[in-house]
Structures are given as C-alpha cells and as structure tokens.
Curated annotation (Swiss-Prot):
The active site is at residue 9. It comes from Escherichia coli (strain K12). PANTHER family: GMP_IMP NUCLEOTIDASE YRFG, PHOSPHOGLYCOLATE PHOSPHATASE. Optimum pH is between 6 and 7.5. Mg(2+) binds at residues 9, 11, 174. The gene is yrfG. GO terms for biological process: DNA repair. This is GMP/IMP nucleotidase YrfG. Pfam families: Hydrolase (PF00702). Magnesium. Can also use other divalent metal cations as manganese, cobalt or zinc. Its cofactor is Mg(2+); Mn(2+); Co(2+); Zn(2+). One of its GO terms (cellular component) is cytosol.
Amino acid sequence: MHINIAWQDVDTVLLDMDGTLLDLAFDNYFWQKLVPETWGAKNGVTPQEAMEYMRQQYHDVQHTLNWYCLDYWSEQLGLDICAMTTEMGPRAVLREDTIPFLEALKASGKQRILLTNAHPHNLAVKLEHTGLDAHLDLLLSTHTFGYPKEDQRLWHAVAEATGLKAERTLFIDDSEAILDAAAQFGIRYCLGVTNPDSGIAEKQYQRHPSLNDYRRLIPSLM
C-alpha cells in the first residue's frame, strides 16, 4: 500500500515505542523466553509446559491493559517482573532509523509524542538505557489513562489531554489492531512498521501502508 503523507497537513506525530522506536527483540526475548523459563523453573515444569501455560495466560488478556501491566504479571505469576525488567534494561536498544527520523521531525516543526502501552516502570527502564526521551516532546503511557490503545476511550482521553487534531496527525505502530483503533478514532495517517524485531522476518499489513525504514520518509518531510 502506497505511503502518501501530505506533511504540510501534519502537526503531530504519535509514535509507539516497542517495535516502533525500539527494537522489539528486547520484549520478545523477555516475554517469550525469559519469563516462561523463569516461571517454569520456579514451578518445576518443563520449558514446553511453561510456554504453553504462558501462551494461554497472554491470550486471555490480549488487547487489554493487563497484557502490558507488570504489576498484573507479577501477581499472576509470582515473579518480580519489575526487577527482571530492570536487570534486562541494557538489552533495550533504539532502531537505527529512530534518531534520524525524530530529528527530522523536530527540524520540520512537528510535535513528537510517544504513546505507548508500556507500563511506567518498563518505560522508565528503557528511557534510562536509550535516552529516547531527549528526542521527544511528550511521553505518554496509556496506564496513566486506564485504557490501552486498542480502546476508543484512550484516544478520546489523549486527544483531550494533548489537544491534538486527529485530521492533522500521523500515527506509527507495529500492531495492526492498534492502527485499526487509531483509524476508527479518525487519525488521518496510520502507518505500520514491518520490521519491529530485527531478528525475525518482516510482517505484512492488510489495511494500512507500512515501511521498514523511517529514513525513507525524510526527503519528503524536509
């Protein structure tokens, strides 16, 4: 699907964090390997049994705020997920195209807002190790509002809190379900990321334009 952004009509760029500005390899390793292995070792079950259990646990709360909530998972699994996140912090890395794109947005006068479903502790750890916050104008965790990006109530709350105009906004995320929610709210431009995890094959989007390198956008932006 062709990317055709009329930049002169864009005031605000909303950006997801994990997989969009940061390499999703951190989260995929944490939630698909480290957490199941740690829970399995604690409970004396095989790695396969632990993974199957975790898959069901994840599925049960998919697209809800609990899916992203470290406190929920700590209580559910009997693990100190916040401490584990802190310990793994050095693994958090920026995508190669993140800083060039964010700086180009700044140079062109666009407002850069982080909108992440990440738990505040998760966000703080990643900011500490990446310095991402130095390249953004505003950082928002959906936990502050009580709804994830999949929920229309979140979009209304964010618009009210920031004053953004949906018809003059670009939103970039690596989840098609979340892009769908943004489009439903009225966000004019919704763009998917095909390579959120540098270690796995690119993904495809059915209903939204997508790309694998933000630097492709810079010439038209400038």
